[in-house]
Amino acid sequence: MGRSLKKGPYVHPSLIKKIREMNEKGEKKVIKTWSRASMILPEMVGHTIAVHNGMKHIPVYITEQMIGHRLGEFSPTRRFGGHPDKKAVKGKIEKQG
């Protein structure tokens, strides 16, 4: 269930403050944030935001198609190690039995 429309989108106050200051100055620096729950607003388009994934900050360039999504959607938190090799698994079973 999503957030009520009458409440408006959630954006961390310090993040929106930094975005607005940079828009006034016309700067395009990378902004580090831990706020994965913040929603992407139209005024963020064109900025690069480094979103924390639990281990490091992943740079995310904001485009128009991302408006309305959350920052955390673009910074995966889980690492996929790959599926096990069938030959290696078969060899382990033969050695045990």
Swiss-Prot record:
* Name this polypeptide is given: Small ribosomal subunit protein uS19
Region of interest (Disordered), residue spans: 74-97
Q: What's a single GO MF annotation on this record?
A: structural constituent of ribosome
Superkingdom classification of source? Bacteria
Residue ranges, compositional bias (Basic and acidic residues):
82-97
Establish whether keyword Magnesium is in the entry.
Answer: no
**Gene Ontology BP, a term:** ribosomal small subunit assembly
- Per UniProt, which keywords does this protein have? Ribonucleoprotein, Ribosomal protein, RNA-binding, rRNA-binding
This chain is encoded by the gene named: rpsS
Specify whether RNA-binding is a keyword of the entry. Answer: yes
Q: Matching NCBIfam families, A to Z?
A: rpsS_bact (TIGR01050)
